[in-house]
Amino acid sequence: MRKGIHPDYQEVVFMDSATGAKFVAGSTLKPEETIEFEGKTYPLVRVEISSDSHPFYTGKQKFAQADGRIEKFNKKYGMSSKN
């Protein structure tokens, strides 16, 4: 690898703004803010959503009921499924 062309890779703390959950991961981001986490000082990156608050990972995901929507459409526009 050529020297001087790659960004500095460092460990940073990502904090979920919605839940306050924190986790350490490697990143090339250079945030100004720092935080004390598990006895060490890390740069802090605040994120709006993470696996701790995303509905897909928390199991609170809503699924659209396609059958009900189709029936509602047919009822609204006078179409019947019995042709």
Swiss-Prot record:
It comes from the Bacteria. GO terms for cellular component: ribonucleoprotein complex; ribosome. GO terms for biological process: translation. InterPro entries: Ribosomal_bL28/bL31-like_sf, Ribosomal_bL31, Ribosomal_bL31_B, Ribosomal_bL31_sf. Keywords: Ribonucleoprotein, Ribosomal protein. GO terms for molecular function: structural constituent of ribosome. The keyword Cell membrane does not apply. Belongs to the bacterial ribosomal protein bL31 family. Type B subfamily. Part of the 50S ribosomal subunit. PANTHER family: 50S RIBOSOMAL PROTEIN L31, CHLOROPLASTIC, LARGE RIBOSOMAL SUBUNIT PROTEIN BL31C. This is Large ribosomal subunit protein bL31B. It comes from Lactobacillus johnsonii (strain CNCM I-12250 / La1 / NCC 533). The gene is rpmE2.
